[in-house]
């Protein structure tokens, strides 16, 4: 099965971290079909890889306004699902 196209809509992450996050999102969507399960998997993996505290929002349509640590934000679309990921808090 070919990988779905990832569309990065907005990010301020460095390339290596961005690439790791995209890899984790792809793995989550391969393993799970429910948005909340995708979000939980991504959050747990990023907390392990990069330290706490990551927040993940998944869905086809949502609005948002968040505060985050500079260099730790990405909004992407994968498999027709929008995924917002950011780090905030300790």
Swiss-Prot record:
Pfam family, one: Dynein_light
Protein origin, superkingdom: Eukaryota
Any one of the GO BP annotations: microtubule-based process
Key words, A-Z: Cytoplasm, Cytoskeleton, Dynein, Microtubule, Motor protein
GO cellular component terms given for this protein: cytoplasm; cytoplasmic dynein complex; microtubule
Gene3D superfamilies: Protein Inhibitor Of Neuronal Nitric Oxide Synthase
Subcellular localization, as worded in the UniProt entry: Cytoplasm, Cytoskeleton
Molecular function GO terms recorded: dynein intermediate chain binding
Cystines in this chain: none
InterPro entries: DLC_sf (IPR037177), Dynein_light_1/2_CS (IPR019763), Dynein_light_chain_typ-1/2 (IPR001372)
Entry keyword Cytoplasm: yes
Role played: Acts as one of several non-catalytic accessory components of a dynein complex.
Family statement: Belongs to the dynein light chain family.
Protein name: Probable dynein light chain 2, cytoplasmic
Source organism of this protein record: Caenorhabditis elegans
Source taxonomy: Eukaryota, Metazoa, Ecdysozoa, Nematoda, Chromadorea
């Amino acid at each position: 099965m070919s990988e779905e196209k990832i569309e990065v809509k907005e990010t301020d992450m460095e390339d290596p971290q961005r690439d790791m996050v995209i890899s984790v999102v792809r793995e989550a969507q391969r393993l799970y079909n429910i948005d909340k399960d995708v979000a939980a998997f991504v959050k747990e993996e990023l907390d392990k890889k990069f330290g706490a505290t990551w927040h993940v929002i998944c869905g086809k349509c949502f609005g948002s306004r968040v505060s985050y640590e500079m260099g730790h934000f990405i909004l992407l679309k994968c498999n027709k699902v929008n995924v917002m990921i950011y780090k905030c808090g300790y």
